[in-house]
Amino acid sequence: MIRCGIGYDVHRLAKGRKLILGGMEVAHSRGLEGHSDADVLSHAITDALLGAIGAGDIGQHFPNTDESIRGISSIEILKRVTKLLAEKKTRVVNIDATIIAEAPKLAPHIAEMRKIIADAIGIPNSNVSVKATTNEKLGAIGRDEGIAAMAVATVEQE
């Protein structure tokens, strides 16, 4: 059976943090606040995958009250969720994701993000789409207060 899930995440930008998107560090004057590495792209994909199998959301599986996972790599979270999918006899078919940010420019990093995500999930790069757009200076994202991401995951369950 083919199933689909959708995910969304947003984090505030803060000084003194590294900006991690799609599992890679992107040069920027600020990074994203969060309990983990705050990688909004990986978090949105994680939620899409969990949604596709009806398994709740990232906060249920990796709560921000769990000090044992403080600072965890969001790529590690993706790997753990992929293992959960395999236990449920489900394979990832496709990921389509969009990052919404005023800065920095992300186009030069998209190919590497796709590779890191595809490797974490165990699918070909061609099955992972990552796009970037701005919020046209509207709202908190448009004022460069944070970065958001949304994702759709298609999975096949036996």
Language-model features: locations:
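RNase III-family endoribonuclease catalytic core
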Residues: M1-E112, I121
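C-terminal binding/interaction regions
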Residues: R3, N94, P104-A107, I123-G142, ...
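Active-site phosphate/pyrophosphate- and oxyanion-stabilizing loops and adjacent acidic/basic residues
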Residues: K115
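The alpha-helix within a helix-turn-helix
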Residues: A118
